[in-house]
Amino acid sequence: MSMLCYTLIIAFLIGIWAAPKSEDNVPLGSPATSDLSDTSCAQTHEALKTSRNTDQRHPAPKKAEDQELGSAANIIVDPKLFQKRRFQSPRVLFSTQPPPLSRDEQSVEFLENEDALNRNIRSKRENHPVNDHGEYSVCDSVSVWVNKTTATDIKGKPVTVMVDVNLNNHVYKQYFFETKCKNPNPVPSGCRGIDSRHWNSYCTTTQSFVKALTKEGNQASWRFIRIDTACVCVISRKTGNF
């Protein structure tokens, strides 16, 4: 009987000594490691699900190239818009090339190649220099071709001017020949050649109306718009000089 008790006690002590002391000693495939693996997988799945939902709520921004392509879409213009002479103006030019430096006194036209452009560059920009007869301009002006995106129409309302015009699968740019004053006072007293003892004077830019191709929504149409077209001298009599 005593031997049996000793045997049971020794077996009990051996079992206690052989038991694992911590989870670090748990072999792979045991219930403890299985629970850890399941927990890790669940956390990973939840993280992926959260990330996917975030991407759906905040989609990736479009590439800059895509945005530029969308904004560069041109309105196709009916060629019939250019068949009426009353819409033509020598100060409006549609060209695929940069326009000549100065206007060549011609009606609205299309320049499609470099040869046509070179034929129009013969006339250079002039700032009203002294000529052979000793004549001077009262005011100094400068004339250049410009692009316009907005303007004021004949009713005084702002309008959108078409810069790019898609005509017969060719993209033209719309240019305007503007003239403006170089300096409001070409001489210290004001305008050149004005008797400053009796007159006040200064140079100012004036505007006139030309037909331009404008757009409203997706529709293109001709409208009168104001552009700078001249530099004139304004004079007023000095008080007390009668």
Curated annotation (Swiss-Prot):
Q: Where is this region: Disordered?
A: 48-69
Propeptide-annotated positions?
19-125
Using the chain's own numbering, where are the disulfide bonds?
A: C139-C203, C181-C231, C191-C233
Provide the GO biological process annotations: cell surface receptor protein tyrosine kinase signaling pathway; modulation of chemical synaptic transmission; negative regulation of neuron apoptotic process; nerve development; nerve growth factor signaling pathway; neuron projection morphogenesis
Q: Which residues are glycosylated?
A: N147
Alphabetically ordered keywords of this record: Cleavage on pair of basic residues, Disulfide bond, Glycoprotein, Growth factor, Lipid-binding, Metalloenzyme inhibitor, Metalloprotease inhibitor, Protease inhibitor, Secreted, Signal, Toxin
The record, for SUPFAM superfamilies, names:
Cystine-knot cytokines
Name the family the entry cites.
Answer: Belongs to the NGF-beta family.
Q: Its biological function?
A: Nerve growth factor is important for the development and maintenance of the sympathetic and sensory nervous systems. It stimulates division and differentiation of sympathetic and embryonic sensory neurons as well as basal forebrain cholinergic neurons in the brain. Its relevance in the snake venom is not clear. However, it has been shown to inhibit metalloproteinase-dependent proteolysis of platelet glycoprotein Ib alpha, suggesting a metalloproteinase inhibition to prevent metalloprotease autodigestion and/or protection against prey proteases.
Q: What's the name of the protein?
A: Venom nerve growth factor 3
> Which organism does this sequence originate in?
Demansia vestigiata (Lesser black whip snake)
